[in-house]
Design a protein with these regions (language model features):
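N-terminal, positively charged nucleic-acid-binding surface of large information/translation enzymes
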Residues: 8-11, 17-113, 477-481
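Non-catalytic interaction-recognition regions
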Residues: 92-96, 106-132, 142, 244, ...
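Alpha-helical recognition segments enriched in aromatics with Gly/Pro capping
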Residues: 1-32, 47, 107, 127-341
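Structural preference for alpha-helix termini/caps and helix-kink/transition segments
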Residues: 279-281, 287-484
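Surface-exposed helix-capping loop/turn segments at secondary-structure junctions
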Residues: 57-60, 111-118, 143-144, 233, ...
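Short, glycine/charge-rich beta-strand/loop segments that flank catalytic centers
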Residues: 63-70, 98-105, 115-130, 148-157
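Short, well-structured beta-strand/strand-turn elements
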Residues: 59-61, 141-147, 383, 471-473
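Anion (oxyanion) recognition and catalysis
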Residues: 54, 138, 466
Length: 484
């Protein structure tokens, strides 16, 4: 398998430190608000990576943090604590909103078939680890105390910028409009390891430390949690491209200064989800949630497919038209799977080998999910029996997680029920001698599209059936079809 490594700016063969266990770390959400679908794009792609590693035989231990303290409204060290700001907004305690939005995040993940990491660690649960690391960084000259805070001294590093080749003056540290810069730093890019009450008098969460009562900075959290659960030799660190600088840059600086050797072999960054007005952002108040997609009639897995149709290293443009197209593609794909006959035939091992090779060629080349989706259509078109096709679709879906077999079974059940007119149930009636599972599945898909107010997709299915010589007549509670 080859994976693009953001730290070296090239695709590299994936060779873990220890093949018996791949150690993978994911930057989790700051739980002061709902995750928007741009955030969730990153988690979808990281989910595919983990599942593909397992698919090709690697055991994986994946750890994710939950930031419930220390992440300021600027990605640098300025502004308000996001958790405190969220608590004030909703008139709740910090821990109340942390629990609420953590639960909401994992509910969104469930709807998108994103596997829960093996270990999920709230940042507030590892204070002792942060203090231990900071103490050593001070003792070894990599950190200093200034006006109530402990800072990492970036001037002590031979190389600070890892994920880009820009000069220092070309990079913005992420100080947003209306946010004052921290004048306690010795150097522009120094960052806080520990805040004391000198920063925010009304900070809700504080702990005793050698430097006074306070709380950890954002960056030290991921270092402490990763080292605690995954040790000093990390294989893969994932996150959105927003995290590359300064967050991941600072993680590397403090982690390698603490352990005294290289820390993580591969860095994976997922690019932005953009709208017509630019990058989706909670700070601008412009964001869409999974719940909103559902309210508009979309299956969340349509959004998962939408993400899979684009490479993770390309910015993806969200429009409702683009999502409609993905929803139509998803419904058609399920209809094709539903038309396959689960007759228990023998598996064609030669076809399995050929088609798996195509699937692996796609995902093994820097996680090309677009080609992996194409591999599903290769299965459907391949000249082999339905049992083999169903086996392969189920096999590939262990990685893509589109619920193809489950959704197809639901379509078949609805189609079977529709053949028996019942009050309140959508019925599909065929002229005598014209029963056809594929036609029934397509008519059912047309009904689902109409129910979701995706009328363009419903019309497309009607036109497609008409071109095949199938005439549909809508009737109360269902539809009747015949060949013409």
């Amino acid at each position: 398998m080859y994976l693009y490594n953001s730290a070296t700016h090239k695709k590299e063969e994936f060779i873990p430190n220890d093949p018996s266990l791949v150690k993978m770390y994911t930057c989790g959400p700051t739980v002061y608000h709902y995750a928007h679908i741009g955030n969730l794009r990153s988690y979808i792609m990281e989910d595919v990576l983990e599942k593909y590693l397992r698919y090709v035989g690697y055991p994986v231990k994946r750890v994710m943090n939950i930031t419930d303290v220390g992440h300021l409204t600027s990605d640098a060290d300025e502004g308000d604590d996001k958790m405190l700001k969220g608590a004030k907004r909703e008139h709740k305690t910090v821990m109340e909103i942390a629990k609420f939005y953590t639960d909401a995040f994992f509910e969104d993940c469930r709807k998108l078939n994103i596997k829960r990491p093996d270990i999920v660690q709230p940042a507030t649960g590892c204070i002792d680890e942060y203090i231990k690391i900071i103490t050593k960084l001070i003792d070894t000259g990599y950190a200093y105390f200034s006006n109530g805070n402990v800072y990492f001294d970036t001037s002590k590093l031979d190389k600070y910028y890892i994920f880009n080749e820009h000069k220092e003056e070309d990079l913005a540290v992420g100080v947003r409009e209306g946010v004052e810069e921290d004048t306690n730093k010795r150097n522009k890019n120094d960052f806080v390891l520990w805040f004391t009450k000198s920063k925010f008098e009304d900070q809700a969460l504080k702990w005793d430390s050698p430097w006074g009562t306070g709380y950890p900075g954002w960056h030290i959290e991921c270092t402490g949690i990763s080292l605690k659960y995954l040790g000093e030799n990390l294989d893969i660190h994932c996150g959105g491209i927003d995290n590359a600088f300064p967050h991941h840059t600072n993680e590397i600086a403090q982690s390698e200064s603490y352990i005294g050797h290289p820390w993580c072999k591969y860095w994976m960054h997922v690019m932005h989800l953009n709208t017509a007005s630019g990058k989706m952002s909670k700070s601008k108040g412009e964001f869409l949630t999974v719940s909103l997609l559902e309210e508009k009639g979309y299956d969340p897995l349509c959004y998962r497919l939408f993400c899979l149709q684009s490479h993770y290293r390309r910015n993806l443009v969200f429009t409702w038209e683009n999502l409609d197209n993905a929803a139509g593609t998803y419904q058609k794909l399920i209809a094709k799977v539903a038309a396959l006959k689960n007759d228990g035939g023998e598996i064609d091992n030669e076809a399995v080998a050929t088609l798996r090779e195509r699937f692996n060629a796609a995902l093994g080349n820097d996680l090309n999910t677009s080609l992996a989706v194409t591999a599903l259509y290769d299965v459907l078109k391949y000249k082999t029996n339905d049992a083999t096709k169903l086996f392969l679709l189920d096999d590939f879906d262990k990685v893509l997680s589109l619920d193809l077999i489950k959704k197809a079974d639901e379509v078949r059940k609805r189609a079977a029920a529709a053949a028996k007119p019942t009050a309140g149930v959508y019925s599909i009636l065929a002229e005598e001698g014209s029963e056809d599972a594929e036609v029934t599945a397509k008519i059912q898909a047309r009904y689902e599209a109409k129910k979701a107010k995706n009328f363009a997709e419903a019309d497309r299915i009607r036109d497609e059936l008409k071109a095949q010589g199938i005439e549909i007549t809508d009737i109360p509670g269902g539809a009747r079809w015949k060949r013409i």
